[in-house]
Structures are given as C-alpha cells and as structure tokens.
C-alpha cells in the first residue's frame, strides 16, 4: 500500500505512536528547531560512520523529492553534520525535512527557515569529510 504525504497531513504524532503501541518513535531528545514544523514522507536513511559527514552530500544527491533524510549519527553531539547550506540544498531539491540523532549548526538560520529540521542538539564544529558512511540501509536513529 502506498500513502501520499497528504494522507498524513492531519494525523498527529501522538496518534501514530498510539497506533504503533509506542514502537518506532523518536527519543524525546530529538526536537524541531522550529516548534511549528512537522514532517512526513518516505525515509531516505543515512548512516554516519566515524563522524564523517560526506555521506550526507551523497544522500542529498540521491534522495527523491518528498523524502525525509533520516540521519543516524549514533547520538554524536560533539560535531554538526549539516547546517544552513545542506538545508538550502535539501529545500531546493524538494525534500520534506531532515531528522538526525546528532547535531546541526547555524541554529538561527535553520530555526527561521520554513524547512523542517529535527535535531538532538546544536554545535558549531564540523566533522571530517572522508566518506565512510552509507545510505539507504537499515538505521537506528533516536531510539
């Protein structure tokens, strides 16, 4: 069965969580940078390995419009895996949003943007870019 994004527009996260008996819900530490934002769409998964953010750029290239980048950063909070530039590219490509169990940067710009971003935290430091991660694999992001 295929669902359209509009099928989910009026369904709350609490209703989904209840229907799924609390399974596959995000950890409470992952929060929207803009409280008015919500996101729905097919997940395009990204697995971060050894704090390498190069795989995020592969995901931006490969993800289909309407998809949500779900970045499994293993809970890392000492570096930011994306910021304002990545969000601008994701928005231009028509992605639905970004969710990460790690950190982003450029919090002021991201919180004022009309693009849904859900993060564990904010930190200005960037990681390495040597391409160790993977895309479109099973990931565990935020719980």
Features from the language model and the residues they span:
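Feature captures the catalytic cores and cofactor-binding loops of soluble hydro-lyases/lyases
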Residues: 1-143
